[in-house]
Amino acid sequence: FKNDEYLGERIEGRQPCYTNEDIITAIENYVIWKVESGIAAGQRIGREIVTIDIAQPDNASFCTCDDCRAVFNKEGCNTGAVLMMTNRAAAVLAEAYPGVYVSMLAYHGTDAPPKTVRPLDNVRISYCFYISNGDFYCNTHHIDDENCPGNFKMNRLFKKWTEMSPNVDVWYYPFQWYNVAFQDPVFDSLYYDMKYLASQNIGGIMCLTSNSTVSLLASLKSYLASRLAWDASITEAEYYAYALEWFRIVYGEDSGENAYTYFRMCETANDILDECCCFFHYGEDMPGTHHMVDAKYMADNFDFMYELYHDALDVAESAGAEFRVKGYFSGMLYVCIGITYEDRYTNGSAEERAVMAERYRECYDLYVECRRTLTVDTVPVGEHGAVDVPVYLTVPLDLERNPFEYWVVDPI
């Protein structure tokens, strides 16, 4: 709700009060209007009209009025009041238009199931593997990895929802957002997570993979996720064969082979590191650094990866393929230069410094030529709201500074 009269007692998050009868009535009226508007436009219940979504604003600043706090104390979480409101809307909808669901996000403050309130039969729960009590979902480890504290906690909450309701869907986030100068090695987790989710009692998966402006491999994620959604029984070998097919299509037969080899090396570097990291919030607390990959592995293989890049350039089939190769491997140069900067440039021999300077200039020129996105910044618009815009490289080249120190800006 945009009108200030609907806000709860914590206005910084623009959350409404979920126990306010006027707000609940407005939401009841909205779901009826939404269905009737669809029918008037020629849509059909059960076909175009299946689910009406209800979701709180994207923050955890819930109302703290006496009624909301009473529900919180009884149910043990903010989910109680939101689910009670959702049930009210669902009850009205079930009477007027049977067969239409109301979907509630279990997300950022509403991920924990309430103690006593249960969703009605026509309520769907969209569980988001995203954030729980300040902990972000970990992309390095699999959703059901019991040795990953964050994922273990979120998976436990997810299982509670599936035990509580047969109508659970999943929002899944295998994507980058802030520090996107380097690709995220998320594909091993994508394979196992999609297979795991397909084995659970859920209705569907909303797989958010960002877009190609933010991540050069966004379409690969969508392609592989679609393959798994179609057939989750495919083997790991078949999965990566589809990835190789994609690289050959996008970068050309021979150039694609080289790009694919580098792609698999990044996955290996992440497996070796084995540290928790949320890739879509990656860079928020550590801008310019790269904790997604093992630094020693990347440093040891920098020269080989550089050869892969130039070999791919030499066999590029077209100007378009050459441009895509440059864009993709520019991330390799950025992360490898940053990792090896102190050893090979600051403390390196004259020969090592000369090689590093040449590669550093080459990397800088590639980022400018290819308009590589470094991060996505949040820019305020007006009094309320914000817009996310891609941030490109605009600073002058400074050989005496590690690119990790100044290329990627802090998101606000």
Model-derived regions, located:
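Glycine-rich, aromatic-flanked loop segments that form ligand/cofactor-binding clefts
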Residues: 1-10, 46, 101, 208
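Structured mid-domain segments that build the active-site/substrate or prosthetic-cofactor binding neighborhood
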Residues: 22-25, 33, 145-264, 281, ...
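Catalytic domains of carbohydrate-active enzymes that cleave complex glycans
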Residues: 201, 228-412
